[in-house]
């Protein structure tokens, strides 16, 4: 970290969701280097220095670095969880759940295969329903007690393609999904470099396409896509895909494809993926508000 600009270092440490956000933190006087106030976004950060941010929202830091990723994606792709019943698939320490709560979610079902990982301030929130020891692949509306309005997911060491049938099956007809695609878990072992970092743009594009293609098989269409505000801790680039049910391609249980359904993404979806992954810019469907034919 020696010699890094303060705004760059704050972003790299997961204390800010973008360079602009980092600069704002510094300008507001909330950045600290080894406990001392730092006032210049361009100022150097000594090697080994401890970075902190004070006076964070609600008086407490987010439950994880990943929280900043979802926070940025909700802004970037213009999604609002206020008043919604949400599912956090792969909740871990609760970073995504934390963001949803702070943004006004009515209730969050936090599902993870592990146990006792949620940060205390997340676990103790009355709006959180903890489902430890639960596989995302096994989820059903009956298990959750209701269909959900919004699904968010941050999963590791598993392809989103393996859980999409379950996730598509638990959303309400008006529901939406915001899933973080991690190419290193989508390209397959044979295509993954020894470093574990997917650097080939074509491979990253194909990773996202694979997720969106599986989503289409479940009756979901790509509404928007954008890059994560932060890279993975290993340096992998990650992407958020916003999916919603298509009225002409309805979700169906257990991955069963409805006879006669169009089960592949349209040309616009592939164009959105190529532009967002290749150009690192958000893309939204042009016909977002146009009525669909049944």
Question: Where is each model-derived feature located?
Answer:
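S-adenosyl-L-methionine
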Residues: 106-165
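A basic, amphipathic helix-loop patch mediating RNA/tRNA/ribosome contacts
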Residues: 1-49, 85
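Glycine-rich SAM-binding Motif I of class I
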Residues: 94-95, 116
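A short glycine-rich, Lys/Arg-flanked "PGG" loop and its adjoining helix->strand segment in the class I
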Residues: 161-178
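Core SAM-dependent methyltransferase catalytic element
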Residues: 232-276
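Short, glycine-/aromatic-enriched active-site segment of Class I SAM-dependent methyltransferases
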Residues: 183-199
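Conserved class I S-adenosyl-L-methionine
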Residues: 81-92
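Conserved S-adenosyl-L-methionine
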Residues: 99-107
């Amino acid at each position: 970290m020696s010699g890094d600009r303060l705004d760059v270092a704050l972003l790299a440490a997961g204390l800010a969701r973008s360079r602009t956000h980092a600069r704002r933190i510094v300008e507001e006087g909330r950045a600290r280097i080894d406990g001392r106030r730092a006032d210049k976004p361009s100022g150097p950060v000594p090697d080994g220095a401890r970075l902190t941010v004070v006076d964070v929202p609600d008086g407490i830091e987010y439950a994880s670095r990943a929280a900043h990723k979802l926070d940025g994606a909700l802004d970037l792709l213009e999604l609002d969880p206020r008043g919604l019943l949400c599912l956090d698939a792969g909740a871990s320490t609760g970073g995504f759940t934390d963001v949803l709560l702070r943004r006004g979610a009515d209730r969050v079902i936090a599902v993870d295969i592990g146990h006792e990982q949620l940060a205390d301030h997340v676990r103790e929130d009355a709006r959180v329903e903890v489902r430890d020891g639960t596989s995302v692949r096994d989820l059903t509306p009956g298990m959750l007690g209701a269909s959900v309005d919004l699904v968010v997911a941050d999963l590791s060491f598993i392809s989103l393609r393996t859980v999409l049938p379950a996730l598509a099956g638990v959303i309400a007809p008006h529901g939406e999904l915001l899933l973080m695609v991690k190419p290193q878990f989508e390209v397959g072992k044979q295509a993954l470099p020894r470093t574990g970092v997917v650097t080939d743009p074509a491979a990253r594009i194909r990773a996202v396409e694979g997720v969106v293609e599986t989503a289409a098989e479940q009756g979901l269409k790509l509404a928007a896509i954008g890059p994560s505000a932060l890279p993975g801790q290993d340096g992998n680039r990650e992407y958020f895909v916003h999916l919603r049910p298509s009225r002409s391609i309805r979700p169906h249980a257990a991955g069963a494809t409805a006879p006669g359904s169009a089960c592949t993404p349209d040309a616009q979806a592939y164009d959105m993926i190529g532009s967002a992954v290749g150009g690192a810019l958000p893309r939204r469907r042009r016909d977002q508000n146009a009525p669909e034919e049944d």
